[in-house]
Amino acid sequence: MTAFELSGEPLTAREREVLTLVVAGLTGRQIAAELGVSRHTVRSHMDGIFAKVCVPNRTVLTAWALLSNTVSADDVRAVWRRWVSQLEAA
């Protein structure tokens, strides 16, 4: 568990997946499309992440995720590659 996970409850696999997409810069709508879920479901995952990590916003969440190595630069690059290839295919 990292220092900011103050609730004592670790992030779920799905929350980590959502977090990676947030760090890559995707919007709630884009995350929902990427995961094949509703925006409401994404919001629920975000609420869970914010409750566990205890940060005030997505900017601080992104900084925390990178500085704590919860999300790696390689994870972000993989998301970007996927999105670029989707844009090129369109």
Stretch-by-stretch model annotation:
Residues 9-10:
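Residue-level "hotspot" positions that anchor or transmit function at local structural transition points
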Residues 14-15:
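The N-cap/first-turn positions of alpha helices
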